[in-house]
């Protein structure tokens, strides 16, 4: 297996790959996708709202906000329910209630271009309920990770009804355990096929985390 493969080099051997349906994402691909900032851009053109972190798991929110800033977000606002978030001074830090925080989030959410919900959020019932409300009612692209995935699936009907009705770009980032929570089974040998099947079922983009992320 992979542990015995040593160094692996990917080289062009002249095959026609024009009809390929699976691609390896490389640094050049990411660079090509990066949008150019317009000459009159300002901080609200690419602002990201992050709802993440909780007591004992503040690092998750901090890492998420830092990643958004490093990836080019023009402004990042971080909130951790019920506790003061921790991040470097360039990150806007807003405290929101531990439960029933959706009204606080929606207060100015229309100014942001993307929303992240879930890393280290915790699983208190009131927090999960508010996270579901935010995910379901947000009218901008949403990335759902960690406890946000748990919140989405926190229903007798699973995550499908909540995610399918959104009608906006949605990305979920499950590891194998969270994938099983959503799909009812762990990913098998063909992780690409399993990720595609879940994406089609939930009408979202699936980033399946692991040693080889799909």
What function would you assign to each model-found segment?
Residues 2-146, 150-171, 176-214:
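Small-residue (G/A/S/T)-rich helix-start motifs and N-terminal tracts that mark the onset
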